């Protein structure tokens, strides 16, 4: 049972997931710091309000308060995170696309086989 667990843990996708979770947690802290320490003060300067977005609220009654600042803070965090993930995925896709193009160019046999296939298709259509 211990050897099965070791084999499971050492599989590539489990390790990749663990690394992703750890980096994701660190990245979340970084984005929260960016929002709190840089974007929040810029918004506060522009609006003349508080530097902590979480403090922004609309008091309807003593018991009913809409904390729109906390929501705004979460929206900014989400947008920053989503944009960075988009950029990372776009970069990785570009790398994979470049590698596939290099592989296709590096294989002259594939090019010859493609030409033969096209000639055979043309011959079948002519008959």
UniProtKB/Swiss-Prot annotation:
GO terms under cellular component: plasma membrane
Keyword entries, A-Z: Cell membrane, Ion channel, Ion transport, Membrane, Transmembrane, Transmembrane helix, Transport
PROSITE patterns attached to this UniProt entry: MSCL
GO MF annotation list: mechanosensitive monoatomic ion channel activity
Membrane protein topology class: Multi-pass membrane protein
Pfam hit, one: MscL
Location(s), subcellular: Cell membrane
UniProt-listed InterPro entries: Mechanosensitive_channel_CS, MS_channel, MSC/AndL, MscL_channel
Physiological role: Channel that opens in response to stretch forces in the membrane lipid bilayer. May participate in the regulation of osmotic pressure changes within the cell.
Family: Belongs to the MscL family.
Record's subunit section: Homopentamer.
Protein's UniProt name: Large-conductance mechanosensitive channel
Protein source organism: Leuconostoc mesenteroides subsp. mesenteroides (strain ATCC 8293 / DSM 20343 / BCRC 11652 / CCM 1803 / JCM 6124 / NCDO 523 / NBRC 100496 / NCIMB 8023 / NCTC 12954 / NRRL B-1118 / 37Y)
The organism's taxonomic lineage, starting at the top: Bacteria, Bacillati, Bacillota, Bacilli, Lactobacillales
Gene designation: mscL
